[in-house]
Amino acid sequence: MIRFVHAIKIGETGLIATLHSKTVKIIFVAILLASLSPAFGGQRFVHAQNGGVTLSAAAGFDGYCKDKRWLPVRVEVENTGPDLDASVQVSYQNSSGGITSTTTEAQLPTSSRKAFFVYIFADGSLRDFTVSLFDGKKVLQKVKLSANCLADTLLLVGVISDTPAAFDGLSDINPLGGTSRVAQLRIDDLPERYQAWRTLDALVVSNADTGVLTAAQKQAMELWLSSGGKLFVAGGAQWQRTTAGLNELLPVEIRSTRNVTDLTNLSAYVEDESPLSSQTTLAVGTMREGARALVEEEGVSILSQKNVGFGEVYYLAADPSANPLVGWAGMKTLYEQSLATRPPLPPWAISTFDSSGYSNPAEQALGAMKELSMPSILYICGLLGLYVVVMGPLNFLVLRRTKRRELAWMTIPALVIIFSCVFYATGFSFRGFTPIMNRLMVAQAWDGVPQANVKALVGVYSPVRAGYDVTAAEGFMPRAFSGSFGDLQADNQWAVLQQDDSMTLPDTRVEIAGMKALILEGSLPALPISHTLTIDLGKTPSSVTGTVTNASEFTLKDAMLITPGGWKELGDLKPGASTDVNLFLTSSSSSFYSSNAGNILNINPIAIQPDVEAARQYSFLQAVLSSSDYSYMNAGNWGVYLIGWMDRSDLPVGIDGRRYDRVDTVLYIHSLTPQLKTEGSVLNLPSGFFAWESSSPLVSPYSAFEIPDEGYILRFKPAMPIQFRSVQSLKLMLVSSNPSALTAYAWNFETGSWTRLATDKMTITISNPDQFVAPNGEARIRVVQDQSTYTEITSTTITMQVIP
C-alpha cells in the first residue's frame, strides 16, 4: 500500500539511459502502479525540485476522512542541504470560495528529517488539497493529495495488524442504516490530538507492537474512546507486543497464556453452529473493576468488555489470525455485535452549534451581552427629555432673564454640540472600552476518565474596529462557526497557525461594536464527582438510587440529575455537598430531551430578557440540546447525568497582546455509571434500561412522525451487559394514532428472519421470546406503515424479563 506522496529529485537523463532494461521496466511498472493507486485509497505525485529537500505527506486514515471532522495530514520533511527555516501549509478551497489553510513552522537543520501532523477541518467541500513547503514566501515544494471523505452514516474501522488479511471480513459488517469501510493503518498513522480521531468509528489491533505509542497518542485514544469510539484488541500467542501500549485500557490485566481445545461458548455467543474445536492459545488474566466477561470457556474469559465514557473496549483472548478463528464465519457476527452498534449520543456530545432554522439559539447566546443590547428605554427617554427641556424652555428662560435673547443663535448650536458629545460618550461607554470574549462552554465528563471533553462557542466582541490574533492553547482546536458571526477573516479565508499544542487565528477582523465567533474543541481536567448509585433489576419498578457527592472546589448551580425516565432538580450542589437520588428508569418518552430550555430551567424566555445572564443560559442550553434539525425526535437515549452551571474560567483561549475581559458560561455534565444488582430469580429490564439505535434519523422509540416507505428498524440492547440463561418475557409497546395502519415485526435470531406480530393491542406480548433475543440481550423491532394513511407513533419501546 502506498502511504506517502513523495516529491523527489530526478537525476540527469543520462543516468536513466545507462540503466539496465530490466531496471527501466521495474521503474515503469512502479510509476504505473502509483498512477493507478487513487483507486485503492492512495495517490502518488512526483515533483522535480532543487535544494535537497524532500516533502512527503499522507492524508487521513488510509486516505479516508469524514465531512465536518478534523483531517490529520502526516507530513515528513527531509533536508540534505543547508539549514532551513521553513513552514508547511495544508490548504484547500472551501465551500465559500475562500482558502482554508493550516500552517506550521518546520526548523530543518542540515541532514535532518522531521515527521509531524498538520490538522485541518473538512468543511464538507474538501476533496483535493495541497501540502506546500515554504521558505518565507517562496514555495520550495508542493504536493497535491486527495481525500475520500465519507458520509457520517458509513462505519470506518481502522486495522493495525501484521496479519491484515485476517480482518478482511470487517468490510462486510452491516451497521444499522449504513455500510462499512476498512482503513489499513500503522501506529504512526494515529494522530496525537483526539479531535482528529473522530473520523474513526472503531479500531482493531492485533499482532502489532503498540509499545511504540507515544504518550500523546495514548491520551488521544482515551479521549476518542470516551467520545464514543470503539477499540477491539486481540490476544493470542503474541499478546505481549499487542498490549504493550494498551494495557491500562483493557478490561483484563493479562498475566499469562493458556491452551484450550474448544471455543464452543464463543460459537454459541454469536449463534454460529460451526465447530471451534482445535487447540488455540488464550492470553488470560484477571478482570479489572468495571469490566465484564461476555464469554467464558473452561473458567477463563474469552471475550470481555469495558466502558470508557461513551466508548467501549473489547478484548478477545484468542488470535483471529490463528486456528480455529481464521476463516471462521462467526467473526463477522462478533465484529457486528461489538463494533457496528452506534446508539445516538446525547445532543450536547454531537451539537455543532449550527442551525438551518430561522433562529439560531447559539447566536442568541453569543449576543446576550449588555454591550450588544439596547440601553434602557427609561435612560433614552430621560436623556431625550433633558435635551428637549434644555434646548427649549430652559434656554429661553435663561436668555430672557439675562436679557440676551439675541444670543440664541450661539447657545442653540453650542447645546447641540454638547448634547451630541453626551450622546456619543454615552454610546461609547455603553459598548465598553476593551474587547470581550463571550465564552460559552459545555464540558462532558465520565466516571473513571481524568479529562472532560469540552466544546466551546467563543465570541470576540470589539468596541472599535480592530484586528485580533486569537490563540487556543493546550490542544484546543478552532473551527469556523457558520452563523452570522462566523466570517472571521477577509475574503472567506480561514487561516490557522499551528505551533506545538496551540493554534492561532491571525488578524480576526471585528467591526465597531461587532462580534465574530468560532468553535473550539479540546479537553480540561474533570471535576471529582463521586456517587453510590445502583440499579436493582430484581425489583419492580427498577430505579436509580444512591448518593451523589460534589467533591470539587466549584459549586454546581441549579444542578439536576437526568435519567431516561425524567429528571430531578437538586438545587445548588456546593463543594463537599451530597444529595440523595431515587428516580425510576421506566420511560415512555424522552421527557428531558424533548423539553425546551424554558421548561427545564423553569423560566419564561420573554420575561428574562432584561436579565442578560439568564437569557444567555437559556439560549445556550437550547443550542446544546439542538444537535440537529431532528434532535427533538431522537435525542433521548440511555444515560444517567449530573448537570449544573459553574464558574470556571480556565478555557485556554485568549487575544494575543491585548487586554480583554471575559464572560464565561459553563454547563458541566458528568455521566454517572451506576452499579448493577442482579439478585433475584427474575430480572426486570425496563424500557429505560435499553440503549437504542434507529435505521432512520427521523425515528426514535418515542416519536415517529415521518415514517420511511420501507418502514423503520429499532435495535435495542441492554445499556449495561448482563448475563442470563433464558428470556421469560418480551413485550413491545406500540402506541400510535392509527394502530390498524401499522404492521410490526420482530427479528428471529434462530431463523434469521422477521416474524410478524399481532398489532391489535398497544402492548404486544411476543411468544417464544428466547428466539427474539440474542445472547447479548439485543432485540430488533421493525414497523411498516400503510402509506395511504397518516399515522403518528409516540412509542416503540420494549420491556424484558430474563432468568439469570
Question: Model-predicted segments: where are they?
Answer:
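Short, hydrophobic beta-strand segments
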Residues: T104-Q107, S112, F116-S125, L583-T586, ...
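Short proline/glycine- and polar residue-rich coil/turn motifs
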Residues: E105-K114, D572-A577, R756-D760, F772-V773
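Aromatic-Pro/Gly-enriched surface loop or interdomain linker
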Residues: L126-D209, A237, R241, A322, ...
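A glycine-rich, often tryptophan-bearing local segment used as a flexible ligand/cofactor-contacting loop or short
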Residues: D168, G177-S180, Q195-A196, V205-E298, ...
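A glycine-centered loop/beta-turn motif at secondary-structure junctions
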Residues: T199-L200, S226-V233, G285-V389, P393, ...
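Accessory, solvent-exposed terminal regions and/or long lumenal/extracellular loops of proteins
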Residues: Q364, M369-L372, A452-T743, N748
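Alpha-helical transmembrane signal-anchor/signal-peptide segments
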Residues: G427-G448
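Cysteine-clustered segments with highest specificity for TGF-beta superfamily mature ligands
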Residues: T759-T791, M800
